[in-house]
Amino acid sequence: KSNSTRKKVNAALFIDGENISSKKAEQIQKIANKQGVLGTEKVYGLQKDECTKSWSDKAKKLDIKDIRLCGNPEKDKVDNKIKKDVNQEIKNNKSVDVVCIATSDKGYTDTVKELRRQGKKVVGIGEKKAPKELRDACSEFFEIK
C-alpha cells in the first residue's frame, strides 16, 4: 500500500532535553515519525545548562526547534514550559490528535491524562527509568535504550 492512501495524522513531538540524552534524538524522532505527520518538533532545555547544550547541535541537524529558557534554573521550569506549549499546540492546531512526549519524568503524568481525556493519543518515549505512572498514563509507551 502506498503512503498516499494511508490516513495522515497530524502529530506533535515535545522533548524534555533535561531528561533525555541527545544521543537518543534519532531514535525518538524515528518513533514519533511512525505516529503520523509531525507538524511540530521541539526540544527544551535551560540556556546555561551544559548537559542540554548537546541538544542544540542535534536539533539543528535533525530540524527540531530548540527552545532555550533563560533566567534562573527553577525547579520544573522546563517541564512547565513544555506543558504550557503542549496545551497551546492542542488549542491552536485542532488537527493534532497525537502528542509524543519524550521524557522519563513522572511530572508529566497529569498532563498526559488530561490530553487523553480530550481524546488525544499520547505516545510516551522514555528510558528504562521512566516510572510506571507515566507509562500507564500514555496510550503507548516506547522504551529507548
Task: Specify the residue positions occupied by each region the protein language model found.
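Residues that line or immediately flank small-molecule/substrate-binding pockets and catalytic motifs
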Residues: 17, 103, 145
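Receiver (REC) domain switch/active-site residues of two-component response regulators
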Residues: 139
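Short acidic loop-to-helix transition motifs that present clustered carboxylates
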Residues: 51, 106-107
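GT-A fold catalytic core of metal-dependent nucleotide-sugar glycosyltransferases
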Residues: 92-93, 106
